[in-house]
C-alpha cells in the first residue's frame, strides 16, 4: 500500500475514529490531508502535526489525493466524494482503512454496545506498561497519551471495533473482546436483535482458529451467542462460572474500585489483587476483560496491576472537572460522561453513588438521536428517575428528523408525570451552563451526559463559575 499510494485524504477528519487513523498514517510517512465541517480541538491538533486540514467541504480539497477515506457520517452527495469518484480515486470506508492498518500488526479488537472505549484504553495502557509499545486507535482521548491514537513500535495494534454501522466486520484481529450486546443502532440491523447478535458472532469468527473470544458471561446478549461461537472462549464476569472472575468487590470513596481477580481460564493462576482507578462495577467488568487479554498474552502480573491502579482515564468517560464554587458560596463536584444509552447512564449513576455516597446527584442530560429516544423512551425515564435532580436538554439530532413524542420535552413530561422528580427543561444547550449554575447546591455531584454538543458544557461551566472562585 505504501508504494502505490502516497497521499490519503480524509473527509470528516475531525471524527474520533477518523482522526486517529489519519494521525497513524501521517506518522507512517504518508501525506495526509483532510476536511471537516467544523473546526475544533481535534482538527487543530492534527494541523499542529503538519496535516493539512480544510474547514468545509469542496472538491478542490482532494487535489492530488490517491485515496479518499470517509466515515459513515459522510454521505454520497459530499462534493469531495463526488469528485473522487468522478476521477476514479478509490473511496475507502474508515473501517476498511483501519483493517488495512491491522494487517501490519497483530490485532486486538474490542467490541460491545457499551464500554468499548474504556476497555480499549485499558488494554493499550496495560500493554504499554508491559513494555510492548502498542499501536492503538480509540474512540476517545486517552488522557495519559493526550491523543486517541498512537503509532507504536511493538507487534500489537489495539482498536475499538464499531458495531454501529456493522463496520467491525471488516476487521481481522487475533484476539477479540465483546463487552456486551444491547439493542442500540437498531436501524443498521433492521430493528432485529437477532441480526445484531449474528453480527457480533460473525465478528468473533473473523479471528483465525487460534484466536480467542474474550466475552462477558454476565451479559444476557453475549450469553445467548456462546453456543454458536466456534473459537476458543474465555469468559469474564462476577458469576461463579466465569473463567476470569471478580470477587470481594469494594467501591472506595473518591472513585476507585478494589477487587480480587480469580483466573481459571484453562490453567489455574494465582488470585490477583486489583485496585482500579475508575469507579463502578461496570468498570470492574471492563478491567476483567483486560486481565483476560493479559492472561492470553501471558503478560506478567505487575504491569497489569500497575496500569489499572494508575489509569488516568479517557476523555468524556466519568471525566472529572474537580470541585467548583456554587454561586451561593458552596462547592460542588463536576463530572462529564459520554453515556447516552439507558444502560450506560444507569452504570454511571451507580458509579457516582458508590464514589460519592450520601451526596445529591444532579444529571444534566442531552438525549442523542430521536430514534434512540423513541426506542428507549421508558428506560430513559426510569434511569433518570434514579437521580436526585435532572436538567434535560433537547435531543441532539445527529442528522435525524424529529419524531413526535420522542423529544426532550416529552421525556421531561414523562418524568414529571412519574412523580419522582421535577425536571428542568433547557431548550437550548447553550443555556445549560447557566441552568446548572442556577440549580446547583452545596455538596452536589453534577454529571453532564450525552454524545452530542453537551460535551462542551463542562468547560463552559468552569468558565462561568470561575469568577466565583
Swiss-Prot record:
Domain of life: Bacteria
Pathway involvement of the protein, from the record: Cell wall biogenesis; peptidoglycan biosynthesis
UniProt xrefs under Gene3D superfamilies: Mur ligase, C-terminal domain, Mur-like, catalytic domain, NAD(P)-binding Rossmann-like Domain
Gene Ontology terms for molecular function: ATP binding; UDP-N-acetylmuramate-L-alanine ligase activity
Pfam families associated with the record: Mur_ligase, Mur_ligase_C, Mur_ligase_M
Binding site for ATP: 112-118
GO cellular component, one term: cytoplasm
InterPro entries: Mur-like_cat_sf, Mur_ligase_C, Mur_ligase_C_dom_sf, Mur_ligase_cen, Mur_ligase_N, MurCDEF_pg_biosynth, UDP-N-AcMur_Ala_ligase_MurC
Name used for this protein in its record: UDP-N-acetylmuramate--L-alanine ligase
Gene (name only): murC
Amino acid at each position: 500500500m505504501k508504494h502505490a499510494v502516497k497521499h490519503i485524504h480524509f473527509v470528516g477528519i475531525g471524527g474520533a475514529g477518523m482522526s486517529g487513523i489519519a494521525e497513524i498514517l501521517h506518522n507512517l510517512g504518508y501525506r495526509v490531508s483532510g476536511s471537516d465541517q467544523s473546526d475544533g480541538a481535534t482538527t487543530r491538533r492534527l494541523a499542529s502535526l503538519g496535516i493539512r486540514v480544510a474547514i468545509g467541504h469542496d472538491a478542490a480539497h482532494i487535489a492530488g489525493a490517491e485515496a479518499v477515506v470517509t466515515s459513515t457520517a459522510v454521505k454520497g452527495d459530499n462534493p469531495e466524494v463526488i469528485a473522487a469518484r468522478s476521477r476514479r480515486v478509490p473511496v475507502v470506508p474508515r473501517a476498511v482503512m483501519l483493517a488495512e492498518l491491522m494487517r501490519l500488526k497483530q490485532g486486538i479488537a474490542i467490541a460491545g454496545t457499551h464500554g468499548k472505549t474504556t476497555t480499549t484504553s485499558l488494554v493499550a495502557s496495560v500493554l504499554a506498561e508491559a513494555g510492548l509499545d502498542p499501536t492503538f486507535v480509540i474512540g476517545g482521548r486517552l488522557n495519559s497519551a493526550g491523543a486517541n491514537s498512537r503509532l507504536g513500535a511493538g507487534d500489537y495494534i489495539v482498536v475499538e471495533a464499531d458495531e454501529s454501522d456493522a463496520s467491525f466486520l471488516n476487521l481481522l484481529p487475533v484476539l477479540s473482546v465483546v463487552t456486551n450486546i444491547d439493542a442500540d443502532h437498531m436501524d443498521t440491523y433492521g430493528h432485529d436483535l437477532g441480526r445484531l447478535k449474528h453480527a457480533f458472532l460473525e465478528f468473533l469468527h473473523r479471528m483465525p482458529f487460534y484466536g480467542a473470544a474474550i466475552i462477558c458471561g454476565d451479559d444476557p446478549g453475549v450469553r445467548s451467542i456462546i453456543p454458536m461461537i466456534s473459537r476458543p472462549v474465555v469468559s469474564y464476569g462476577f458469576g461463579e462460572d466465569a473463567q476470569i472472575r471478580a470477587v470481594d468487590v469494594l467501591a472506595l470513596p473518591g472513585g476507585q474500585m478494589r477487587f480480587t481477580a480469580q483466573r481459571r481460564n484453562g490453567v489455574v493462576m494465582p488470585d490477583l489483587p486489583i485496585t482500579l482507578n475508575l469507579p463502578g462495577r461496570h468498570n470492574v467488568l471492563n478491567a476483567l476483560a483486560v486481565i483476560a487479554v493479559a492472561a492470553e498474552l501471558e503478560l506478567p502480573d505487575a504491569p497489569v496491576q500497575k496500569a489499572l491502579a494508575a489509569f488516568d482515564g479517557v476523555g468524556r468517560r466519568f471525566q472529572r472537572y474537580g470541585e467548583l464554587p456554587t454561586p451561593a458560596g458552596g462547592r460542588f463536584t463536576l463530572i462529564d460522561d459520554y453515556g447516552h444509552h439507558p444502560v450506560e447512564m444507569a452504570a454511571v449513576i451507580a458509579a457516582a453513588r458508590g464514589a460519592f455516597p450520601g451526596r445529591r446527584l444532579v444529571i444534566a442530560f442531552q438525549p442523542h438521536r430521536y430514534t434512540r429516544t423513541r426506542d428507549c423512551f421508558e428506560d430513559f425515564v426510569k434511569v433518570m428517575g434514579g437521580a436526585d435532580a435532572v436538567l434535560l436538554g433537547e435531543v441532539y439530532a445527529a442528522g435525524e428528523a424529529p419524531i413526535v413524542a420522542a423529544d426532550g420535552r416529552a421525556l421531561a413530561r414523562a418524568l414529571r408525570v412519574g412523580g419522582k422528580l421535577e425536571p428542568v427543561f433547557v431548550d437550548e444547550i447553550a443555556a445549560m451552563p447557566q441552568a446548572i449554575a442556577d440549580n446547583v447546591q452545596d455538596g452536589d455531584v453534577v454529571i453532564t451526559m450525552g454524545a452530542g454538543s453537551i460535551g462542551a458544557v463542562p468547560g463552559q461551566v468552569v468558565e462561568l463559575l470561575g469568577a466565583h472562585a
